[in-house]
Structures are given as C-alpha cells and as structure tokens.
Swiss-Prot record:
Entry keywords, A to Z: Membrane, Transmembrane, Transmembrane helix
GO cellular component, one term: membrane
Membrane topology: Multi-pass membrane protein
InterPro entries registered for this protein in UniProt: RTA1
Annotated protein name in UniProt: Uncharacterized membrane protein YLR046C
Organism: Saccharomyces cerevisiae (strain ATCC 204508 / S288c)
Length: 270
C-alpha cells in the first residue's frame, strides 16, 4: 500500500493545494485494489473445495458429488484470469500507457467480464446436464462452447500484455523508465494467463474427445495438465507478492506523478 509520505502528498492533491491545471493523477484506493484480488482468492477456495469433493467422490461415489467437483474445478481458473485481467488494466493505467492497450480499459474490462461470465455460466449449466444420460451430450457441447469463449478471452489478454510489453520497451513512459519492476510484474501476469489458457485448452481437448476418451479415463492427464498448472499459478503469485504487487508499484507511480505535478507547480509559481 502507499507509504505514509505518499498518503500525505495524495491528501494535499485531493485538497486542491495544487492548481487545477496541474491536478491530474492516476491512482486507485487501497480498497479497490484489494477487491481486484478477490476473484483470485475465491478461485483458490473453489479449487480447494473442488479437490476435497474429488477425494470424497473417490471414497464414496455419487453423481451429485461428481457434478459439484467438476463444476468447481472448471470455473475456478476463470476467476484467476479475471483478477489477472483487472490487475493488468490497472497496471496499464498506473504507468500512463492505457492508450497502448488493444482496447481501452473502460471498454475491455466490461467486455472481458461479460464474456468470461458467459463462459462460466455455460460451463456450470453444462456440468449440471452431465448428470443425466439424455442431456449429457448437450452438457458437453455447452462446456466446450464456454471453454472456447474463455480461450478467446485469454488469448486476447495474452496479446494485449505482449503488445503493451513491446510498447513499454519501445516508447516507455517516465514511470516505466524509472523502474524495471513493471516489466517483471507484467511477466508474472503473463505467466499466470498462459497457465490458465494452457489448462483451458487441455479441458477443451478432453471434452472434444468425449467423456470416454483417453484423457477422461486416465486421471494422470488431468493431474499433470490441470492440477499442476493450477497449483503453480497461485504459488507463483504468492511467492512474488511480497516483492512485486500492485500496492507497492502504485506507490512508485504515485510518487513519480506527484513529483511531476509539484515540479510543474513550482515552475508556474516562478
């Protein structure tokens, strides 16, 4: 979070001690940044509950337990992706390079959330239909459509991150030039979305091949290409969070922006 010094300086800005023409600054309240991480935490919880139910199903098989664990494990990674997207959008704004996003943040956020939600709903409905033999094929199709929607979203986000990374190298803002931590943070987000997309592609292959396919009949495939990937993702974020998180990076951005505004104010007073 912002340091005490930065908070005092933000307070000065908020109380209009700077002249109006020099009072533009980009920052997010700490509570807003905390909520940006909420889908990620929820995804971890759903993954945990999903695997607990998987153990319960192995010891005491029932169709309801199977459906519940399947739906939770299908939906949880999309929550990781949602947090990654929101963090990426905020990062682009904090480095004053939102113009280099493939779609402006205010439009892309709504589009991503809606598309991702549609994908999740289709997977949840499809997972429910798997319980009935007559509707099992319909459920499988709905899950596949939902997964393809998410693959499109995640691929778009990947290209957005790569394009912004290129622009950060080619035409960096003053904030980016001040520290390479922004590049490192973008790499963390990029690694996260690649893991989610890789896992989603494996799931599409599984359902395209059918529930009786090799992947469906051999649990090790899902453990290697789903469980391991989704274990690595939160592990990477948790391991790097102390050193690289948006709270600390925002503090750097705010300080640079305020220094620039105060310099302008000093020049205008002279």
């Amino acid at each position: 979070m912002a340091t005490h010094t930065s908070k005092r300086r933000i307070h000065r800005w908020e109380n209009n001690e700077l002249s109006e023409e020099n009072s533009t600054i980009i920052y997010f309240p700490a509570r807003g940044l905390m909520w940006t991480h909420f889908p990620f935490v929820l995804g971890i919880c759903l993954e945990f509950v999903g695997y607990v139910l998987k153990i319960v199903f192995i010891n005491s098989p029932s169709i309801s337990t199977f459906i519940a664990q399947s739906v939770l494990l299908l939906i949880a990674p999309s929550l990781y992706a949602l947090s990654i997207f929101m963090l990426f959008s905020k990062m682009a704004r904090l480095i004053l390079m939102e113009a280099y996003m493939l779609i402006p943040a205010k439009f892309s956020t709504v589009s991503f959330v809606v598309a991702d939600m549609i994908g999740r709903v289709l997977q949840a409905v499809g997972g429910g239909l798997l319980s009935s033999w007559n509707s099992r094929n319909t459920g499988r199709i709905l899950i596949i459509v939902g997964l393809f929607i998410q693959i499109f979203c995640y691929t778009f986000l990947t290209f957005s991150q790569l394009f912004l990374h290129y622009k950060m190298k080619a035409t960096p803002s003053k904030i980016v030039r001040d520290s390479n931590e922004w590049f490192q943070y973008n790499f963390i987000l990029l690694a996260g979305i690649l893991l989610v997309n890789g896992r989603t592609i494996v799931r599409v292959v599984q359902f395209l091949m059918g529930l009786q396919s090799y992947i469906g009949q051999h649990e090790w495939c899902l453990y290697v290409f789903d469980t391991v990937l989704m274990f690595l993702l939160p592990l990477i974020f948790l391991a790097t969070f102390r050193a690289r998180n948006l709270f600390k990076l925002q503090d750097k951005s705010v300080n640079i922006q305020l220094n620039k505004l105060l310099d302008k104010e000093s020049v205008s007073e002279d």
